[in-house]
Amino acid sequence: MNYKEYIYRLRKEDFYQFLLDYGKGVRLLEEGKEYVVFAVYEPLQGFKLVEVREIKVITPKESFKPITLGEFVVLPPWLKPIFINPGSAFGTGLHPTTQMCLKVIEDFFQEGWSAIDVGCGSGILSIALKLKGANKVVAIDIDPQAVKECKANAKLNHVELEVYQAQPKDINQTFDFMVANLETHIFFEVMEDLVKLFEKRAVLSGIYKKDELREVLKLLRNYPLKVKKRISKKGWFCLVVDKV
C-alpha cells in the first residue's frame, strides 16, 4: 500500500499562520532561518508545490521478523512454525533444495489437496503440507531411520501423517500433489512410478547444476507433464510441473 506526500516551502511567518488555518497534521521536513519545508497528505490550493513523493507503507507482516531471545523465539501469529528434532535424516530446512520446496508448497499448493512426500527424510515437507491445509499426507522413504524420525517430528508438530518405509512403486494410491526432493539419478530410475502418484501438480528437486537440469527436462518430455515454474538457489534447481 502506498500514499502520496505533497511537499511545500513557505516563509516561517507564513507557515505558522498556515498551521493555524489548516487545522490538520503536517510533517516538518526542514526548518531554516527564513523558510520551512513541510509535507501534507493532500494537495493545497493556492500554494506552489515543490515535490510529490510516493511513500510505501510497511505493514506489520513485512516489518515483524522472528526474534530469538536465549532459548525463546518470538513469532507473529501468521507464521507457521515447524519443529524439527535434528537427526540423521535429511531435511532441517538449511539445504537450498528444502528451502525451495517449502517456498513452492507455500505458493503452489492448494488447501484441501491430498499429497505425497517421496523421500521424506525428517518429514519437514510433509509437515509443511499439513500446515498448509492438506487433507491427507503420505510420507515415504526407503531409510528406516528417516521413517522413524519423520513419525517423531509429526508427533512433535501435532500433525497426522501416514509414514511408510516404501518405494514409489509400492504405493497404490494417487494424490493431488507430490513433492520429490531426491538425488537426480533417482528420477531416471523411478520417474515412471512417480508420474503415477499425482494427478495435478508435483515438485521435483535435488537437481544440481545446469547439466543435470537439462537431463531432467529432457526426461520429462517423455511424460504428460508441463513445467510451470523453475526455481534455482546456489546451483540447485527445483521444478514445479503440472499434469496435462
Predicted features and spans:
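N-terminal auxiliary segments of SAM/dcSAM-dependent transferases
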Residues: 1-77
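Hydrophobic anchor at the start of a short beta-strand
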Residues: 26, 47-50, 136-137, 161, ...
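Short, well-ordered coil/turn elements that cap or connect secondary structure elements
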Residues: 44, 69, 79, 110, ...
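A generic structural signal for beta-strand entry/edge sites
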Residues: 33-37, 81, 201, 236-238
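Conserved SAM/SAH cofactor-binding pocket of Class I
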Residues: 92-171
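S-adenosylmethionine
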Residues: 103, 142-243
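SAM-dependent Rossmann-like transferase core, predominantly class I methyltransferases
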Residues: 57-110
